[in-house]
Amino acid sequence: MRVLCCLDGTNIEHISRALSTLVIDAERTIGLLYVTDSGPHHEIERKREWLLRPRHPSGPLQEKIQHAEAGASQDILQEGLRYLPQAETLSREGRPEQEIIQCASEWHADLILICPRSPASGGPTSGPKSVGHVARFVLDHAPCPVLLLRQFAH
């Protein structure tokens, strides 16, 4: 079974616990996916163009931003490998909801594991607003079954 695990930088422990109860090691291939969201860059530019003159990050500023994002992505994937050393790491850049669907299809995933929303984003833990837009899109468009991993109530 090919299981694609969607990382957000805070959920690897939760995902590794769920994986240990779902499928035995010998019967699974794990992919750890982290998507660097390009959406905020475009949103900032649209706001800037509306309020001020257009200014696109260029030169050293753009390089710093890209370097920081690449470093964060690698850190998150390395943390994932600490919990699941046999996993394959997959890194993408773009809109997370679309990249997850595309990666699941290209990687031939049998199952996608995703949390309803990042704990850092706040929001309700149950009810219709408890599932964020990324998880909602994945649930609606995935090419395979999706397991939504909610946090345990303490």
Model segments located where?
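Structural beta-alpha unit
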Residues: 79-112, 117-119, 153-154
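Glycine-rich, Arg-bearing micro-motifs that act as flexible, cationic patches
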Residues: 111-140
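General small-molecule cofactor/ligand-binding pocket signal
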Residues: 31-33, 88-92, 147
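Active-site phosphate/pyrophosphate- and oxyanion-stabilizing loops and adjacent acidic/basic residues
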Residues: 17-20, 78, 136
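A short acidic, glycine-rich active-site loop
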Residues: 54-72, 122
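Conserved acidic residues
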Residues: 1, 110, 143
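Small/aliphatic-rich secondary-structure junction motif
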Residues: 1-59
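Short, flexible loop segments at boundaries between secondary-structure elements
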Residues: 136-154
